[in-house]
């Protein structure tokens, strides 16, 4: 199974693909799509959409995972992240890729074994889990890999119980 994890954002959308076979995880590719701060918002969303479509076409994931939107105190940030998330969901749906959504707590528990793990602990667990020499950068790319790892660990159970 080739799983694409996406950490949505308008300035930076992290993405990472892992392959999960016979209980073993392997990094396929990781990166981030970025948009310039001065670019009009609709153009930023279009650039993210086109970039994600290119990644999907090039790397051919079987499945995808996106973190559920967390509503913090900053409503404007939540709205723009929600729009970037919508762009990602659209690109995945158009490509016919099944999408699964995970709460931040579930991602932390799956990757670090602890729902209270901080960002640094999560990044280190991503590095260790995939056998990488360094933590993937930017942070959004490491976050996307954590989401992909969470899905790779969770998907077999979902399939076994007919929930995928």
From Swiss-Prot:
UniProt GO BP: DNA recombination; DNA repair
Residues where Mg(2+) 1 binds: 7, 140
Function text: The RuvA-RuvB-RuvC complex processes Holliday junction (HJ) DNA during genetic recombination and DNA repair. Endonuclease that resolves HJ intermediates. Cleaves cruciform DNA by making single-stranded nicks across the HJ at symmetrical positions within the homologous arms, yielding a 5'-phosphate and a 3'-hydroxyl group; requires a central core of homology in the junction. The consensus cleavage sequence is 5'-(A/T)TT(C/G)-3'. Cleavage occurs on the 3'-side of the TT dinucleotide at the point of strand exchange.
Organism whose genome encodes this protein: Chloroflexus aurantiacus (strain ATCC 29366 / DSM 635 / J-10-fl)
First-level EC class: hydrolase
InterPro entries, per database record: RNaseH-like_sf, RNaseH_sf, X-over_junc_endoDNase_Mg_BS, X-over_junc_endoDNase_RuvC
CDD domains, per database record: RuvC
The protein's name: Crossover junction endodeoxyribonuclease RuvC
Gene Ontology CC: one annotated term: Holliday junction resolvase complex
Catalytic activity: Endonucleolytic cleavage at a junction such as a reciprocal single-stranded crossover between two homologous DNA duplexes (Holliday junction)
């Amino acid at each position: 199974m080739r799983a694409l994890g996406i950490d949505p954002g308008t300035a930076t959308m992290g993405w990472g693909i892992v392959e999960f076979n016979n209980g073993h995880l392997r990094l396929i590719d990781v990166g981030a799509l970025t948009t310039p701060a001065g670019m009009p918002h609709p153009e930023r969303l279009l650039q993210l959409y086109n970039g994600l479509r290119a990644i999907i076409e090039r790397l051919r994931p079987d499945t995808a995972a996106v973190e559920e939107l967390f509503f913090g105190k900053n409503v404007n940030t939540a709205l723009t992240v929600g729009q970037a998330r919508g762009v990602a969901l659209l690109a995945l749906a158009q490509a016919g890729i099944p999408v699964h959504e995970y709460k931040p707590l579930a991602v932390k528990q799956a990757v670090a074994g602890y729902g209270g793990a901080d960002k640094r602990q999560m990044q280190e667990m991503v590095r260790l889990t995939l056998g990488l020499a360094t933590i993937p950068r930017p942070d959004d790319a490491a976050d996307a890999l954590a989401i992909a790892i969470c899905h790779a660990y969770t998907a077999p159970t979902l399939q076994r119980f007919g929930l995928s």
